């Protein structure tokens, strides 16, 4: 990955999470949405992301899940779910490529779901 690539909030990245994984932590090549702010994305060696899954039929709905259709983004060839309960930092070194971006409305829903995950909304605590 080109270290000078400008990563922006809302970008969809392919990330190499390695072959080893445990439990619900997914390994291999994963699509992820960038949720960290653009100032951090510019200067930090770490990017905060939310993993995506295309297994929409297998997932129970949680308030931390955001459905993403192909029309709401570029770079995905099928509908996916942003798993915002799995927000995580990644090193830039594991980014393989930027493949697209979610639209502003979807990014707003992902932001709200991340806020639910970290306890911003009292009704979910």
Positions of predicted regions on the chain:
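Hydrophobic alpha-helical segments that mediate membrane insertion or helix-helix packing
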Residues: 32-33, 110
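C-terminal terminal-subdomain/extension
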Residues: 5, 71-125
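Compact nucleic-acid interaction/catalytic patches
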Residues: 24-28, 34-70
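Short, surface-exposed secondary-structure edge patches
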Residues: 1-6, 23
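Short, charged beta-turn/beta-strand-edge "cap" motif at the junction between a beta-strand
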Residues: 18-22
């Amino acid at each position: 990955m080109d270290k000078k690539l400008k990563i922006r909030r809302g970008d969809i990245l392919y990330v190499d999470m390695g072959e080893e994984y445990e439990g619900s932590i997914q390994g291999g090549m994963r699509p992820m949405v960038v949720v960290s702010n653009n100032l951090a994305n510019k200067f930090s060696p770490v990017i905060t992301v939310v993993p995506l899954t295309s297994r929409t039929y297998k997932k129970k709905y949680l308030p931390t899940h955001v459905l993403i259709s192909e029309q709401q983004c570029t770079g995905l060839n099928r509908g996916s779910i942003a798993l915002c309960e799995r927000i995580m930092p990644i090193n830039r070194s594991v980014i393989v490529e930027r493949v697209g971006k979610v639209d502003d409305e979807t990014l707003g829903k992902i932001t709200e779901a991340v806020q639910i995950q970290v306890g911003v909304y009292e009704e979910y605590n």
